From Swiss-Prot:
Pfam families: Acylphosphatase. The lineage of its organism: Bacteria, Pseudomonadati, Pseudomonadota, Gammaproteobacteria, Oceanospirillales. This is Acylphosphatase. It catalyses: an acyl phosphate + H2O = a carboxylate + phosphate + H(+). SUPFAM superfamilies: Acylphosphatase/BLUF domain-like. Its EC number is 3.6.1.7. GO terms for molecular function: acylphosphatase activity. It is an enzyme of class 3 (hydrolase).
């Protein structure tokens, strides 16, 4: 069940450091669906859909990221996107 969908844009050293794959791992562990994809401006866009507490847990992790990353900002907004059935990398 998807209580909530949230879209996040993560800024910093987040491309080429395993950020999307680590985000997928965190999301799947939390039971959250969505996607993570690189943007041309160097950010990563993340869609998270799931129980509110699980989405919040992954958002908190986005501020940390995997060891090779350096997150400087995470911007979030509620999303109206239809919830996907899995977590995809783009």
């Amino acid at each position: 069940m998807h209580d909530r969908c949230l879209k996040a844009w993560v800024t910093g050293r987040v491309q080429g450091v395993g950020f999307r794959a680590a985000t997928r791992d965190q999301a799947l562990t939390a039971g959250v669906t969505g996607y993570a994809r690189n943007l041309p401006d160097g950010r990563v866009e993340v869609l998270l859909c799931g129980e509110s507490s699980a989405v919040d847990r992954v958002v908190r992790w986005l501020w940390q990221g995997p060891p090779a990353s350096r997150v400087t900002h995470v911007e979030c907004e509620q999303a109206e996107d239809p919830p996907p059935g899995t977590f995809e990398l783009g």
